């Protein structure tokens, strides 16, 4: 009977008081532990932080004494920094305020400097090419079909390699270089520019050639589809199908590549 009476209904008031006491003890112990950990850190901050950068205000003549801390004057432009008394308890908070103001001032000065030095910039997409140096900033990826013509690229690459080898050999020959005239350097630069122009011209011709070839193949496929459709409809005749492009208003072009 006694066991049944104990397990029937607990006293919630007693249980609440016990839990409240335990919670208060835990809070006090955690607060004490946190303060004990924070004390060495604050001492180290007070020792490492620069103190006395504010201006001390003297209200009356009685403050002049041996125990009064000496004022230390900081920079004149620090108008927004807080006054800090050397050796006072408020030195840490004043120092934090002063450092925050200094950081804000530096950030603002940098922002004004960036705004004054801002210039309009045109960003160019520079893509390396296999057969010519990309000094003019032209987008080489806009000419995707040129990648299919390996012989053109090989010719231009070998021409550039030959010019580079010639320049290296000339640089090794010091005596002959000293005997050369002063106009030899511009002539080599002109040769390089001429080779670049030739490579670009060859690329453009190859692109036009490929375009014409693709158009010719497309036209042949269209004619073949038309012939197949007419054959399926039952209209058979070789003479009629030869003139289908003319009937539909498509002139016949002979494929003539560039030479």
From Swiss-Prot:
Asked if the keyword Signal belongs to this entry, the reply reads yes
Stretches the record annotates as 2 X 5 AA repeats of R-L-R-F-H: 119-150
An example GO biological process term is: neuropeptide signaling pathway
- Propeptide positions in the record are 35-102, 181-195, 237-259
| A single GO molecular function term of this UniProt record | hormone activity
Gene Ontology CC terms: extracellular region
Q: Where in the cell is it found?
A: Secreted
Q: Positions of the sequence repeats?
A: 119-123, 146-150
Region Disordered, annotated ranges: 42-103, 149-197
The protein, known as: Ovulation prohormone
* Organism the protein comes from: Lymnaea stagnalis (Great pond snail)
């Amino acid at each position: 009977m006694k066991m049944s009476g104990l397990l029937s209904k607990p006293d919630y008031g007693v249980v609440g008081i016990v839990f409240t006491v335990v919670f208060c003890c835990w809070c006090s112990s955690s607060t004490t532990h946190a303060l004990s950990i924070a004390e060495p850190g604050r001492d180290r901050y007070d020792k490492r932080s620069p103190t006395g950068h504010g201006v001390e205000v003297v209200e009356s003549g009685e403050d002049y004494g041996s125990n009064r801390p000496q004022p230390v004057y900081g920079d004149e432009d620090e108008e927004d920094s807080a006054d800090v008394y050397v050796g006072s308890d408020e030195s840490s908070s004043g120092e934090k305020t002063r450092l925050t103001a200094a950081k804000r001032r530096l950030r603002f000065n940098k922002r004004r400097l960036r705004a004054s030095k801002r210039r309009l910039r045109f960003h160019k997409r520079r893509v390396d090419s296999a057969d010519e140096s990309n000094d003019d900033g032209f987008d080489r990826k806009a000419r995707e079909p040129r990648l299919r013509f390996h012989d053109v690229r090989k010719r231009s690459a070998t021409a550039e390699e030959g010019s580079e080898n010639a320049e290296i050999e000339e640089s090794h020959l010091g005596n002959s270089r000293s005997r050369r005239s002063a106009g030899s350097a511009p002539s080599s630069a002109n040769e390089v520019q001429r080779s670049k122009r030739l490579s670009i011209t060859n690329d453009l011709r190859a692109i036009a050639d490929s375009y014409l070839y693709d158009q010719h193949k497309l036209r042949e496929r269209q004619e073949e589809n038309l012939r197949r459709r007419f054959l399926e409809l039952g209209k058979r005749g070789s003479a009629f199908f030869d003139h289908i492009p003319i009937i539909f208003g498509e002139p016949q072009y002979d494929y003539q590549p560039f030479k």
